[in-house]
Amino acid sequence: MIQVQTRLKVADNSGGIKAMCIKVLGGSKRRYANIGDVIKVSIKEVVPRGKVKKGDVYDAVVVRTAHGVRRSDGSRIRFDSNAIVLLNTKREPIGTRIFGPVTRELRSAQFMKIVSLAPEVL
């Protein structure tokens, strides 16, 4: 579960390394975001010559959480860290590669581009 002030890893090659959640989108009093939800993030750490700059604000989709996701068959998938993929204004990924696995829940959340770029879908 992601909330405001949560530090996240950037799981694409857009140039960001770390980001911080500044808003959970989808309702005025919404507090938590899970896998597949869109949040607003501020970039905190970048690689040199990347597409994004420190301090920039972007939309991002949550692809991995330490809290995990529960499936209808009763299983639960958890990850070691919280990770996001940065999105542009058209809700398309900024990067051209995704690092690490993503879950099937992104497929139902209309993020097929991210699912197709990911090296592994759990």
From Swiss-Prot:
GO CC annotations, alphabetized: cytosolic large ribosomal subunit
Ranges annotated as spanning the membrane: none
GO MF annotations, alphabetized: large ribosomal subunit rRNA binding; structural constituent of ribosome
Source domain of life: Bacteria
UniProt record, GO biological process: translation
Pfam families xref list: Ribosomal_L14 (PF00238)
Keywords recorded for this protein, A-Z: Ribonucleoprotein, Ribosomal protein, RNA-binding, rRNA-binding
Function: Binds to 23S rRNA. Forms part of two intersubunit bridges in the 70S ribosome.
Family: Belongs to the universal ribosomal protein uL14 family.
Quaternary structure (record): Part of the 50S ribosomal subunit. Forms a cluster with proteins L3 and L19. In the 70S ribosome, L14 and L19 interact and together make contacts with the 16S rRNA in bridges B5 and B8.
Record protein name field: Large ribosomal subunit protein uL14
